[in-house]
Amino acid sequence: MTDERGNFYYNTPPPPLRYPSNPATAIFTNAQTYNNAPGYVPPATRDNKMDTSRSNSTNSVAIAPYNKSKEPTLDAGESIWYNKCVDFVQKIIRYYRCNDMSELSPLMIHFINTIRDMCIDTNPINVNVVKRFESEETMIRHLIRLQKELGQGNAAESLPSDSNIFQASFVLNSLPAYAQKFYNGGADMLGKDALAEAAKQLSLAVQYMVAESVTCNIPIPLPFNQQLANNYMTLLLKHATLPPNIQSAVESRRFPHINMINDLINAVIDDLFAGGGDYYYYVLNEKNRARIMSLKENVAFLAPLSASANIFNYMAELATRAGKQPSMFQNATFLTSAPTRSIRLPLI
C-alpha cells in the first residue's frame, strides 16, 4: 500500500533545501525510494515540519513592524483640491452662521442652495406641533407659575442687589454662558465671582445705553439692526452681491443705520459734483482729496464758477453744444438749469 500523502508531496518539486551541498531540485517517483538512505525523513515528520514552518512564517508576518514609509500620502494636486474643499466648507459655514456672502460668487451661492434643496428633498425634517395649552388663561397661569419658581432661584440670590437688574430667567440661562466666555478666565467650572462680574458689567452697559437713549431721544437699537448694517457695510466694501433680504431692507428704508450709509454716499456725491459744500474732506483720503481738488480747479479754469459749480449741468451743456441729442428719459434739470446769459464755453 502506497503512501498517497507522500506521493503528493514527492511528485511536486520541493523548495530549495537549507544546506547548499544538497541538490537544489529532485523528483521522487515513489515514497519508499531510498528509505534507508541517510538523512531520510518520514512523510509524517516532514508534514509536521512544514506545518511548523507555515505557523512560524504566519507569526513572522503577523508581528512584522509597521513601515510608515508605505503609508499613502497625498500628492500636490490632491493637497490643493483638499485645501480648496476645506476653504469652501468654511465659507459655507460662515454664510449660514452670519449671512456673510462677501467671499461667495453668485455661482457658489446657487451651488450651496442646490445642495440644501437636495438634502431637504431627500431627507425632509419631520415637524410635530403639539398644542400645549388649551386656552390663553391656561398659558397665563403657567407663565405666572414659572415666574414664581424662577424668582426663587439660587443663581439670582447669589448676585449683589446693586448689579442684578435682569430677570431670573436671564440669570439662569443667558448670563452664565456670557460669564463663562468672557469673565471666567478660561476655567472649566463657572465661578460666582465671574458671574457677579459679568452681571455688574452688563448692568453698567445697559444703564449707559438707557441714559444715552433718553438724552438723544433715540431708542436703544436692537442687535439685529446693528448686525444688518455691519453686514451691509461689509458687502459694500467687498463689492459683493447683495442678498435679496438686504436689498429689500435698503429699499424699505426702515432701518436707520442702512439709511445713514446710503445718505452719506449720496451727500458726498452732491458735495463733489453738484455744487455742495466741502464736507467731503473728512471722508476722502489724501489721494482722492487731491484728485477732487485738481478736478474742481480744472473745471473752474475752463468756465466761470457760476457755470461750473454743478459739474453735471456743465458736462450736459457741453455735450449738448457738441451736438448730443438729449434722450427722452433724461432729467429735465439738465435742460432747464442752464444760465440765462449766453456764455461761450470752450469745447473739450
Curated annotation (Swiss-Prot):
Keywords: Glycoprotein, Late protein. It comes from the Viruses. GO terms for cellular component: virion component. One of its GO terms (molecular function) is structural molecule activity. O-glycosylated; contains N-acetylglucosamine side chains. Pfam families: Baculo_gp41. Belongs to the baculoviridae gp41 family. This is Structural glycoprotein p40. The gene is P40.
